[in-house]
Amino acid sequence: MNRQFAIPLDDIIIRRLKSDPEFATEMFKSSVESLFEGDFHYALRMLRCIVKAGIGFTALSKAVGISSQNLHRALSDRGNPTIRTLNKILTAIADFLGIPRPQPSFS
């Protein structure tokens, strides 16, 4: 049986993201970890929620130089963004959230 909820899960997550910056930061970190673990569907879904709750697709489009339509497509359930596109998106979201970029260390 497929249940329909009164409020879609993404909407609940977006509300929490808007009201809790720490949650947004942790969600972003979790999304990046999910990318490394190969759980692309989860990662793209959470990144999409973070964008909707914060920076927005229009501002993200301006920040990364990719049309809003292509960003929607890249972060959709069927999205398959290139590494270059994903890097631009992750960098812009991290900047928006105030997450410092790690510096590579070569030993």
Feature locations, PLM:
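Short alpha-helical DNA-recognition segment
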Residues: 53-72
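Intrinsically disordered, low-complexity and often Lys/Arg-enriched segments
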Residues: 1-3, 102-107
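DNA major-groove recognition helix of helix-turn-helix/homeodomain DNA-binding modules
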Residues: 83-100
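Residue-level detection of the helix-turn-helix DNA-binding "recognition helix"
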Residues: 76-77, 94
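N-terminal flexible/basic segments that precede or flank functional cores
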Residues: 1-44
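Alpha-helix N-cap/helix-initiation sites
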Residues: 21, 25, 40, 57, ...
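Short, amphipathic alpha-helical "recognition" segments used to contact nucleic acids or chromatin
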Residues: 40-54
